[in-house]
Amino acid sequence: MHIAALHQPSQVQLNQDGNLKHFLTIEGLSKENLTKILDTAQSFLDDNNNLINRPLLEGRTVMNLFFENSTRTRTTFEAAAKRLSANVLNIDIARSSTSKGETLRDTLWNLEAMAADIFVVRHSSSGAAHFIAKDVCPKVAIINAGDGRHAHPTQAMLDMLTIRREMKKPFEDLSVAIIGDIKHSRVARSDVAALQTLGCKDIRVIAPNTLLPVGFSEYGDHVRLFNNMDEGITGCDVIIALRIQNERIDSPALSSQSEFYRMYGLNKERLSLAKPDCIVMHPGPMNRGVEIDSSIADGEQSVILKQVTNGIAVRMAVLALSMQGQLQEQGLIDAIAL
């Protein structure tokens, strides 16, 4: 399964009315589509950043299918579904029939027959969620919880919500730096795509050459690549630090983790080069002392734990929006900002 096979994702993700049917990738969605997700997520948070429960998916069944390990993403999807009053089933892939040789198609068809409304899928193969939505279970709403190096759209949207809530200014006026293992990161790709779609004109991608993918500059004129960390973060509003994806690296990309920290680790001295009100983000899991110093991760400018709360709100929004047509039919549409 390869990214190159993913043609015209908007035709798969949106229904004939232009509303969300599946959420597979940021690419192919408009600024209006993304803003709708952010506005809906915002409606699930009060002024004190507390989550608001809404029984919008009562009677629906959400199945979490994680073919890769996860803590935050799987747990926040489960929390999001339960806050919407959905039935939640966490499928133990390691003990499922796939371990006995059953194909992915047969596994999914059997789960679909159990009256699943939404599949939340994480898979090591790039394009897996798109394949499922287009060719296997098109009638079930498919939410991509991360596919290989390709995309992590809900992470990108929770990052965008965090930036919007914390910075309180248009994306057009922000400078955002993304630091770390860009080459192997689905978060980096989705964040850059979301930032561009929402109008950010100063996106800085910072990494050694060995951790920069070929062709990343094709995202457009507003993306700049930096090998020099200090130069890249000077004057920025937002810093997103990424861990080194050791599980996806086929050949040595670094001389050592200590060398990476020396050259690219975010510490107090480097953070002082950014704007005084710069916020620091990280999708997790963090490797303290590698891409980020503990004093920064736990410091006043860190919004890392707020990202987790915002992640539940965003995933509530995506789950609800994927059921939008049915919610409209049942008169529940006015309950949230859809």
Swiss-Prot record:
Record's GO cellular component terms: cytosol
Alphabetical keyword list: Pyrimidine biosynthesis, Transferase
Catalytic activity: carbamoyl phosphate + L-aspartate = N-carbamoyl-L-aspartate + phosphate + H(+)
Enzyme class: transferase
Annotated metabolic or biological route of this protein: Pyrimidine metabolism; UMP biosynthesis via de novo pathway; (S)-dihydroorotate from bicarbonate: step 2/3
Catalytic activity, EC: 2.1.3.2
A GO biological process held by the record: amino acid metabolic process
Positions that bind carbamoyl phosphate: 72-73, 122, 152, 155, 284-285
Binding sites annotated in the UniProt record for L-aspartate: 100, 186, 243
Single GO MF annotation: aspartate carbamoyltransferase activity
Cross-referenced Gene3D superfamilies: Aspartate/ornithine carbamoyltransferase
UniProt record similarity statement: Belongs to the aspartate/ornithine carbamoyltransferase superfamily. ATCase family.
Function of the molecule: Catalyzes the condensation of carbamoyl phosphate and aspartate to form carbamoyl aspartate and inorganic phosphate, the committed step in the de novo pyrimidine nucleotide biosynthesis pathway.
Record text on subunit structure and interactions: Heterododecamer (2C3:3R2) of six catalytic PyrB chains organized as two trimers (C3), and six regulatory PyrI chains organized as three dimers (R2).
Name by which UniProt lists this protein: Aspartate carbamoyltransferase catalytic subunit
